[in-house]
C-alpha cells in the first residue's frame, strides 16, 4: 500500500498477553513500510525478539521499571506476580513517564499506541501527537466496563447482549482481582481503562466486526469517538520454529483427535485443592491428556502438588507440566482433539482457529465474558459448570470434556458444526488483509489530518 509513511511509538502493558498482540500489529504495519519504536521492559526483550519479523522497521527500546514497595525487587512483568499485585506494577509503569517522554523527544513519532498508561494522551499533547488506545481484550469486556456498578446478570440499557454478561455466580472472578495491598497506588484498572478510552484520539480494537460488531458500535456510541478494528491480527506461522521434540514424541503416541490439552495462561495460579481437582477431572475423562499450568499456590513444583497416587495411575496416558509450552503448535498437532482453556483473549482466537473442540474454565472477569461470547453467543464451546464460590469439581470438568469429545454427543456435534463455520469465517484469506489495509488508511488520515464521513 502506498501513501503516507508514518512512525508509531508503542507502549503496551507489561504482560505477555498485551505485548505480543501489539507486536503482531507492529509486524503488519512494518510490512507496509511504516516504522515502529516498541517500548518494553528489559526482561521481555528476549521473550519477544523472535516475533519481530521486520527488525529494520521495528526497533525495541527497553525501559527500566522502577521498584515499588510491595513488589519483589526486580519485578518487571505481570507474569512474575499474583494478579492481586497488578495495581502495584501499574504504579511502577506510571513512574516510567520521564523515560517515555525522553524516547518521544528522541524518535519523534507521529502516533503513540498505548493501553494502560493512561497518561500517554497528556504526554502526546505536549508534543502535538495523536494517540491510539489499542484494546487487546475483547470488545465485550470494554463494553461491560463502560457501565460498571449495575446488577450482575442484568444488561444495562442499550447494552448489546443479554448473554455476554457477568452473572451472580461470577462474582468470585472479580474478588480475584481485588488488590491485597493497602498502599495508595493511583488509579485502579477501571479508572485507567476509562480515562484511556476517553482521552485518546482514536480507539482501536483487536477484533472483527463479524464476531463483535455490536459491541464495537456500543463503544463508539458511548465514547463518542471513532473505533477502528484491526481484525484479530494473528502472527504469521513461523516455519523456522517447530514443536519441541519431547512433545512431538509424546503426542505422536496417540490416535488423531484423542488428546485433551489444558492450558490456563501465564498469570493463573490455582489453589492447591483446585489444581488437584483439575488433575483428577482430566484423569476421570479416560482420554489421554496434557496439562500445562503453573505450580499451585504454596507449591514450588508440580510434582509435590499432585494428588496421591496420581502419577502412577495416569502413567503412559497423562502428563502435567509446569513450564511454558508452544500452545499454537500443540493445538495444531493432529493428536490433539480438545482444548481446555481459561479463555484469555489470545487463547480465545487460537482456539477459534484450531480444529479442537473447546472447553472453557475462565478464571478472571474478562475471561468470563470471552467465555460467554464463545459458549452462549456463538455456541462454539462448552463452559465448565461451577459453584458460586468459583469451585469446579472433577465431575463437572469431566462432563464438559466428554460432552464435546464423544462422537454421538448432540452438544458436541452442535459446537463442532458452529466452530467449523466461525473458523472458516475468521480464517478466510481476505479477512485479515482487508482489516489491516483499512486500518492503515485510517491511521494515514489521522496523521495527515484528513477526515472521511
Swiss-Prot record:
Keywords: Glycosyltransferase, Transferase. UDP-alpha-D-glucose binds at residues 266, 325-327, 342-350, 364-367. One of its GO terms (molecular function) is UDP-glucosyltransferase activity. GO terms for biological process: anthocyanin-containing compound metabolic process. InterPro entries: UDP-glycosyltransf_plant, UDP_glucos_trans, UDP_glycos_trans_CS. Its EC number is 2.4.1.-. Transmembrane segments: none annotated. Pfam families: UDPGT. PANTHER family: ANTHOCYANIDIN 3-O-GLUCOSIDE 2'''-O-XYLOSYLTRANSFERASE-RELATED, GLYCOSYLTRANSFERASE. Belongs to the UDP-glycosyltransferase family. This is UDP-glycosyltransferase 79B3. It comes from Arabidopsis thaliana.
Amino acid at each position: 500500500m502506498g501513501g503516507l509513511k508514518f512512525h508509531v511509538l508503542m507502549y503496551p502493558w507489561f504482560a505477555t498477553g498485551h505485548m505480543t498482540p501489539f507486536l503482531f500489529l507492529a509486524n503488519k504495519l512494518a510490512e507496509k513500510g511504516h516504522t515502529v519504536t516498541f517500548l518494553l521492559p528489559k526482561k521481555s526483550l528476549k521473550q519477544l525478539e523472535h516475533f519481530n519479523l521486520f527488525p529494520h522497521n521495528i526497533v525495541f527500546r527497553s525501559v527500566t521499571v522502577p521498584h515499588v514497595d510491595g513488589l519483589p525487587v526486580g519485578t518487571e512483568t505481570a507474569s512474575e506476580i499474583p494478579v492481586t499485585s497488578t495495581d502495584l506494577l501499574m504504579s511502577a509503569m506510571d513512574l516510567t513517564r520521564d523515560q517515555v517522554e525522553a524516547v518521544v523527544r528522541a524518535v519523534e513519532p507521529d502516533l503513540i499506541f498505548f493501553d494502560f498508561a493512561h497518561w500517554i494522551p497528556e504526554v502526546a499533547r505536549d508534543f502535538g501527537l495523536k494517540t491510539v488506545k489499542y484494546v487487546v481484550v475483547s470488545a465485550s469486556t470494554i463494553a461491560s466496563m463502560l457501565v460498571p456498578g449495575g446488577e450482575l446478570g442484568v444488561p444495562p440499557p442499550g447494552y448489546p447482549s443479554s448473554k455476554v454478561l457477568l452473572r451472580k455466580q461470577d462474582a468470585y472472578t472479580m474478588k480475584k482481582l481485588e488488590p491485597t495491598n493497602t498502599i495508595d497506588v493511583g488509579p485502579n484498572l477501571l479508572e485507567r481503562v476509562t480515562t484511556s478510552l476517553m482521552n485518546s484520539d482514536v480507539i482501536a480494537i483487536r477484533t472483527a466486526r463479524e464476531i463483535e460488531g455490536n459491541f464495537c458500535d456500543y463503544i463508539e456510541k458511548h465514547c463518542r469517538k471513532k473505533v477502528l478494528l484491526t481484525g484479530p491480527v494473528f502472527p504469521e506461522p513461523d516455519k523456522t520454529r517447530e514443536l519441541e521434540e519431547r512433545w512431538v514424541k509424546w503426542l505422536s503416541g496417540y490416535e488423531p483427535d484423542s488428546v485433551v490439552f489444558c492450558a490456563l495462561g501465564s498469570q493463573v495460579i490455582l489453589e492447591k485443592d483446585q489444581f488437584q481437582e483439575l488433575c483428577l477431572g482430566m484423569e476421570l475423562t479416560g482420554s489421554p491428556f496434557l496439562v500445562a499450568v503453573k505450580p499451585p499456590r504454596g507449591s514450588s513444583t508440580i510434582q509435590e502438588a499432585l494428588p496421591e497416587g496420581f502419577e502412577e495411575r495416569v502413567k503412559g496416558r497423562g502428563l502435567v507440566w509446569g513450564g511454558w509450552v508452544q500452545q499454537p503448535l500443540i493445538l495444531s498437532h493432529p493428536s490433539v482433539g480438545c482444548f481446555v482453556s481459561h479463555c484469555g483473549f489470545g487463547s480465545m482466537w487460537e482456539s477459534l482457529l484450531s480444529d479442537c473442540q473447546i472447553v472453557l474454565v475462565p478464571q478472571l472477569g474478562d475471561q468470563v465474558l470471552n467465555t460467554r461470547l464463545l459458549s452462549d453467543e456463538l455456541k462454539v464451546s462448552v463452559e465448565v459448570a461451577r459453584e458460586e464460590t468459583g469451585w469446579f469439581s472433577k465431575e463437572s470438568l469431566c462432563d464438559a470434556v466428554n460432552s464435546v469429545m464423544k462422537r454421538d454427543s448432540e452438544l458436541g456435534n452442535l459446537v463442532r458444526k458452529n466452530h467449523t463455520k466461525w473458523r472458516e469465517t475468521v480464517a478466510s484469506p481476505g479477512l485479515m488483509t482487508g482489516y489491516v489495509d483499512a486500518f492503515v488508511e485510517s491511521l494515514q488520515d489521522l496523521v495527515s489530518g484528513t477526515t472521511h464521513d
